[in-house]
């Protein structure tokens, strides 16, 4: 059985950035859960999405707009379970850039990849495939994340 936050995240699939001078109010709501509190939907928002989803369950997220902030949240787990917060490197494993989303399982089309439900994946909430070699860590809530 998937954790509650996966059900919440799945209901957000399809929310996307608005091109031009307007902003998607839902993405701005995601941003409101971080200290950055960005005012535009073009500002990277993968961590904001994870913070928002986690907050909907009554847990406390990182409050950071940085994807890599999740590497210090909860407890690390060696083997991912559905719903595990998954932190992925972007430019290089040592860069500060990253991506974060929720682990859904192995990619059925390529066993060297995983499926991640996340925000700001091609400017929308979606399910995307990532190479497992790019995973920096899988995280799970601990008692410290209770609000």
What are these regions (language model features)?
Residues 127-147:
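Intrinsically disordered, low-complexity, charged/polar segments
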Residues 1-62, 142, 146-147:
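N-terminal capping segments
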């Amino acid at each position: 059985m998937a954790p509650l936050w996966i059900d919440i995240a799945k209901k957000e699939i399809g929310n996307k950035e608005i091109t031009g001078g307007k902003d998607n109010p839902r993405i701005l709501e995601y941003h409101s859960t971080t200290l950055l509190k960005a005012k535009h939907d073009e500002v990277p928002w993968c961590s904001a999405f994870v913070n928002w989803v986690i907050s909907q369950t009554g847990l406390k997220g990182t409050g950071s707009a940085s994807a890599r902030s999740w590497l210090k949240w909860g407890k690390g787990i060696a083997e991912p379970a559905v719903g595990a917060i998954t932190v992925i490197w972007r430019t290089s494993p040592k860069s500060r850039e990253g991506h974060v989303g929720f682990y859904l399982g192995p990619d059925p089309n390529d066993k060297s990849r995983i499926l991640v439900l996340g925000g700001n994946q091609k400017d929308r909430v979606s399910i995307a495939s990532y190479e497992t070699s790019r995973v920096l860590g899988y995280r799970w809530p601990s008692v410290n994340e209770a609000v």
